[in-house]
Amino acid sequence: PIKSSAASDVYKRQLLTVDNGDFAAEVEEISYDQIPMLDKDSAEKLGNRKLGELADMVSQFEVAGDYTQINYKGRPVRVTPLRYGDWIKWLNNRSQGLPAYLVIDMVTQNVDVVRLDQGIRYTTAEHFGRNLNRYLRFRYPTYLFDAPAFEIDEDGNPFWVCPRIRKTIGLFGGTDIAGAVLVNAVTGECTYYDAADVPSWIDHVYPAELIIQQYDYHGTYVNGFINSLFGQRDVTVTTDGYNYLAIGDDVYMYTGITSVVSDESNIGFILSNQRTKETRFYTVAGAEEYSAMESAQGQVQQMKYAATFPLLLNIADQPTYFMALKDAAGLVKMYAMVNVSQYQIVATGSDVAECESNYRQMLARYNLIDDSDANIPADTQEAAGVLSDIRTAVIGGDSRYYLRLQGESVYYVISAADAPQVLSLIHI
């Protein structure tokens, strides 16, 4: 704990610099066909299912739980290595190494198994001298490391990015990242880079948890140590939870910022580049993430779907929470968009295109965008079939009908206010 005014000033200034930003100008507007639809849990399900389809691997290997989110050739993906099923399987296969890694496209949900000419020999799940943490300890005995991140370069070569920790305030305080050791997962070749010199294809140098800790210091001691205890003028902290946003060739961590007095609203949020730690604060008063999740769940309350932690998007220059809605089995059934500033603006859809279309129409209805910007995406598909289930709910005074067709697992949502001519047929 920090116990002096001088120490608090050092923590505020030395660890993290936060600039103000313009969300609409700096965060590129994203189209429905570019929205990452997979959270880590869904990616894990797809990865395990894919491995189960490979007869030559499923009996010997398992999918490791890394699922690092990176930008790969301009696409947001999650990558993860394999691991040995048990000790016996390790003994039988260790000479060849792990034969492949998985790449999960977060937009298309395609899973690629990338087979390697030479197997991966250095991982966090290895044993003895090839265990990555032990390997680093012998190669760099004086370094302290944070948790390594599995990444691939633009040629698909697997690496471990191992951030080097340094203490910048006294002997034990002011944790920061001095640089990173890049370990070739196949050959074990190591290269150290200072933080400013890390190759641009690397996405994870500064862990999200460290950035959050540093911002909390920054927000707590913004007006000094005494103010952090008494008065607490302008004191802010991060909200619970965070997610990632792809901007350009980099991955940014974002989290909400709220006042130190616990409430259910944000005063804004930060975006922090996980390669450079460049951090910007965006003033957008609105709902905090869990309130937005509850709003989305309220739209489909009769389905009892659970919302994933939201992704922050720019839709029509509006900061927007996007999330998947899952059933009790963890399967994605619908998608939701919630306006950050006005979280009563909630739209859902059975696919992302429908969800965005409904959301844009609601923005136009609230006069946040022009009608010309509320067009339905060109390739939105019509659904036809025999109704197998109809459910109703009244939300905000508006009757909503949830329709399911025979042979499908998703529900289509129709508002009585928006389509009375269609709903009249339902009562025939």
How would you describe each model-predicted region?
Residues 1-7, 11, 426-427:
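Single conserved hydrophobic/aromatic residue that forms the stacking wall/gate
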Residues 15-198, 274, 339-343, 347-353:
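Soluble catalytic regions of membrane-associated enzymes that act on cell-envelope
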Residues 78-83, 159-165, 251-258, 320-326:
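Short beta-strand elements that form the blades of beta-propeller/WD-repeat-like
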Residues 90, 263-270, 331-336:
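Structural motif
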Residues 244-294, 298:
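Long, repeat-rich segments with strong aromatic
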Residues 376-397:
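Structural detector for short beta-strands of small beta-barrel domains
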Residues 397-413:
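OB-fold (S1/OB) nucleic-acid-binding surfaces
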Residues 418-426:
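Short nucleic-acid-contacting surface segments enriched for D/E, G, S/T with interspersed K/R
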